[in-house]
Amino acid sequence: MADFEDRVSDEEKVRIAAKFITHAPPGEFNEVFNDVRLLLNNDNLLREGAAHAFAQYNMDQFTPVKIEGYEDQVLITEHGDLGNSRFLDPRNKISFKFDHLRKEASDPQPEEVDGSLKSWRESCDSALRAYVKDHYSNGFCTVYAKNIDGQQTIIACIESHQFQPKNFWNGRWRSEWKFTITPPTAQVVGVLKIQVHYYEDGNVQLVSHKDVQDSVTVSNEAQTAKEFIKIIEHAENEYQTAISENYQTMSDTTFKALRRQLPVTRTKIDWNKILSYKIGKEMQNA
């Protein structure tokens, strides 16, 4: 082990550690971090060298965070990244400091937002919040309005998770939707992601994503937001249905084919006989 450590540079160790961290299953960041910490055995190197991995993980996972003094949770995403570990909460018009290791928010400060897109963002945010409340038992969303390459763009992010470590599984749903405000119609682009980890008596992961394209009629803010949500609802329902159907098919065919129909002896086991033999033997020994 010592020879191996001598041959591997600190840079390579950090690269490997960062890879483990960015691929941590949802809800298991701390477990992976602690394991990597033991393997690396150098806290300073890990914190300094892999800090970008901590940030990337939280942004990729749409990590929700509660800001003290504010009711709604906000998602940590690349769209809200202001640099220097500060992030935007467009709903409350504030920025805040985010600790990527502790996953805690602090130092909320007022933040200027694009006033020309205020009504568009608020209409989409209001419609999306109602949708998420109806469809996700533990869901959160954040809507951004930005100028990207000179185009006024709405970006909607959704996150929902269920962490059940006592039952040996964790899962997260993420979706991201964009459209540009370009009347009379605009292209809607979305990506849907599901990641589930089940690890009781085994280690099984579901990692799935789907890209979606559609178009929305751009009229006034409220009507466009309504049509935008209809597209999201249809695509997400369709995706969830397809996932369920695929699992049923796999259960009926693929997984069934993996199971051995008969033991190696090619003879079915008569469990009742085995039980009677065992009882008889125990009675003999009594």
From Swiss-Prot:
Q: Which PROSITE patterns match?
A: F_ACTIN_CAPPING_A_1, F_ACTIN_CAPPING_A_2
| Main subcellular localisation | cytoplasm
A Pfam family that the UniProt record links to this protein: F-actin_cap_A
Q: Which Gene3D superfamilies match?
A: F-actin capping protein, alpha subunit (3.30.1140.60), F-actin capping protein, beta subunit (3.90.1150.210)
Query: Where are the N6-acetyllysine residues found in this chain?
Result: K19, K97
Enumerate the InterPro entries for this protein: CapZ_alpha, CapZ_alpha/beta, CapZ_alpha/beta_2, CapZ_alpha_1, F-actin_cap_asu_CS
> Where are the N-acetylalanine modifications?
A2
Task: Tell me where in or outside the cell this protein is found.
Answer: Cytoplasm, Cytoskeleton
One GO term of the cellular component aspect?
cortical cytoskeleton
According to the record's subunit comment, the protein's assembly and interactions are: Component of the F-actin capping complex, composed of a heterodimer of an alpha and a beta subunit. Subunit of dynactin, a multiprotein complex part of a tripartite complex with dynein and a adapter, such as BICDL1, BICD2 or HOOK3. The dynactin complex is built around ACTR1A/ACTB filament and consists of an actin-related filament composed of a shoulder domain, a pointed end and a barbed end. Its length is defined by its flexible shoulder domain. The soulder is composed of 2 DCTN1 subunits, 4 DCTN2 and 2 DCTN3.
In Swiss-Prot or TrEMBL terms, this protein is called: F-actin-capping protein subunit alpha-1
Species of origin reads Sus scrofa
Name of the gene this protein is made from:
CAPZA1
